[in-house]
UniProtKB/Swiss-Prot annotation:
Residues 173-335 form the SUN domain. Interacts with EMP65. This is Uncharacterized protein slp1. GO terms for cellular component: cytoplasm; endoplasmic reticulum membrane; membrane.
Amino acid sequence: MVKRRLSAFGNAFLIYFIIFRLCCCSPQTSHWCKYPALCLKSPDTHNENLVCDAYLSVIATKSEEKEASNPTTWDFTPTNKYQEPSFHTKTSLNGSDTISSNFLSKYEYSNGTSTSEFIDSISPPLVNETSTISSSKKLEQNYSVTEVIDTNIITSSSVTLPISEDGSSTSAAATIDSNIDEKTVAFSEEKRFNFASTDCAAAVIKTNPEAVGSSSILTENKDKYMLNKCSAENKFVVIELCEDIYVDTVQIANFEFFSSIFRDFKVSVSGKYPKYESSWMELGTFTALNLRTLQSFHIENPLIWAKYLKIEFLTHYGSEFYCPVSLLRVYGKTMIEEFEEANEDFLEQKVNDGSAIKADEIRKPQESPIFVDEEDTDVQSKPVRKNPSVELNSTDTLLSSTVISKSLSTVVIGNETGKSESYPATSTRSFNDISPSSSSSYSTAQISTFPSNQESIYKNINKRLSTLEERKKAFDEIVEKILTNYGKHNAKNMNFTQLLHELNSTLQLEISKLSKSVVKPSLFALQAKLELLSAENEYFQSQITSLYQESSFQKRLLMLQLTVLIVLTVYMAVSRLPENLPTTRSSSNNPIEASRPPFSRDEQDISKANDFRVSASSAVYTVGPELLQRKKRDPNTSIRSIHEREQDKIIHSRSHSVC
């Protein structure tokens, strides 16, 4: 049993070795390969694509035949649809797409084979799946493969892809880096700073709900990627960049096999994170190639200084389940870089203007004055040469961006015939752009590359400083005129001051004479009257003081008399009281009981209550010894009647004493 298994294993290993020798050969060993088109990978190169060397093997085999006169075509179909050629694509000036293969080849082949036959023979998937190549109408171009020694440098072997005769092309040019592991990258983008990297604190702000691992696209690790379902309706990613930049290049890559590659996508930017989707500013819609390499997309008009970048994936190649994105890079210019470039251009223009002015001074042409209209005052500047090849402004007053204040809003230049034309001060036309036959001149300013783009803060500050300098110059001119006028009137002011001084001295002399003759005698008389009045005032004050003292004495005497009168009145009233007032309980030894009246108020209340509410028999009275004696004298008289009589006597005696 073991022997059978070992023999089967040996047979399988032998079959595998034979197939490997037949199919996995290199271009250098293609002279003994029976099927060079089946070569999968070259051991001498580090290319990740598995079909490039197969194409090279076909080219090398055909190059050995050296059939330049007879066009040769090849029929080749890749063994795997995911094994795609690694091409470096860029847009040339004439509009044709140039593909440069990054591989090592020691063969040179050149014949009259048309480009359509070459593309159809060696790369059917690229032609069929890419919308940028028209299979019906193609221009015939020759191709060549040249020898390159260093494998780390992109070779000069290239193939010019055909374009349609009507000039149609893609909406954006895609630059594909076939070997991102190598040091040399197309357009030297690798040397630039990536503003969508986690090294500078860039972050993924938002993605569609189906996206997984979105932060992986900001790292350089090829094994990590943002995974997205191709069936998702709205696939997007929002990234916060490191700084506010002018976005000029976006690079996207998908290195994953057995997955669909993005095709059409839209790039939008915003300075602040927008609340609404309509706030995003679209930079363009781009079409990528069906290649698993780093693809570059250049943006012509960045519009604004972007802090947030949004990429929406619209379509994709193939019909796989997942549409991953492995890497994203964003390149651009910061505000300070834009300002430095503008400053360099300004310095170059300043040097050119200075040389032009020096050359014009030698010619000594006819001069004509220039007038500047202001809101309130017309200011005439120095004459300027009429030659249109000379700039209007000198090197001392030339600014990086011509921004004149409201007071210097219009420039009017006269000519020999008396005609004049007015132009705003923000005109971007210079003297160098006008032919010598022109009859008018224009002010100079820099021409911006993108006039609709948002200006940087440094450029805005520079413009404000330029405006401030212009206003200061205008202010200095006005102050100089004012000082000139002041100098003219200064002599008149001095004469007027001297006249006032002489008049003042004359008036002082006249006033002193008048005071000596008139004012002093009157002053003496007034002083005598004042002394007399002060003496009379002192006499009146002494009289008033004596009267006050007398009145206070009389007041005290009156109070004393009133007091004595009151005392006498009280005494007389007390002395007139009757002496025989009846008293009750006089025999009592208690003085308090003796001083009590015959009956108290409580007893009166009781008697009144008995009169009105109770019968006479139930009345209670206090009976003294006198009442008992009277009762004995007159038994028919009741105690009540006797008591009433006594009360009448008491009341009568009291009223009499008071009277």
